[in-house]
């Protein structure tokens, strides 16, 4: 569980992105589906678009995700540590917990050679 206030799919994000600040959280494959879905959290209203700290948070978060998808586990984990305190401000500590747990699991258990960086949800 990402434990964030609002979680939306790409189709909803496309409808609201001009009115709200969104952070792209993850790419997931829902149980029973083949194609991955990008999921977002709604983090603030239009006025929040001027929040420099929020932009910086998102930049580091997306950097962490690039490291994660590229299997650079140490760099990804370091980025989650940098995100921990600002994540509290935005109600996203659960998201950081999810990524830290995944990174620990993936670097200790390895990943398949064809892993595409998409998390497979095993339950609906």
Regions found by a protein language model. Give the residues of each.
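Cytosolic regulatory/linker segments at or just downstream of nucleotide-handling modules
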Residues: 1-75, 80-95, 99-108, 112
């Amino acid at each position: 569980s990402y434990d964030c206030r609002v979680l939306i799919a790409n189709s909803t994000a496309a409808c609201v992105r001009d009115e709200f600040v969104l952070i792209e959280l993850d790419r997931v494959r829902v149980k029973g589906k083949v194609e991955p879905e990008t999921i977002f959290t709604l983090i603030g209203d239009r006025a929040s678009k001027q929040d420099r700290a929020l932009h910086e948070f998102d930049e580091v978060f997306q950097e962490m995700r690039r490291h994660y998808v590229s299997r650079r586990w140490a760099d990804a984990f370091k980025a989650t540590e940098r995100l921990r305190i600002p994540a509290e401000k935005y109600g996203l500590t659960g998201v950081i917990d999810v990524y830290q747990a995944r990174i620990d699991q993936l670097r200790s258990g390895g990943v398949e050679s064809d892993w595409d960086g998409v998390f497979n949800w095993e339950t609906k």
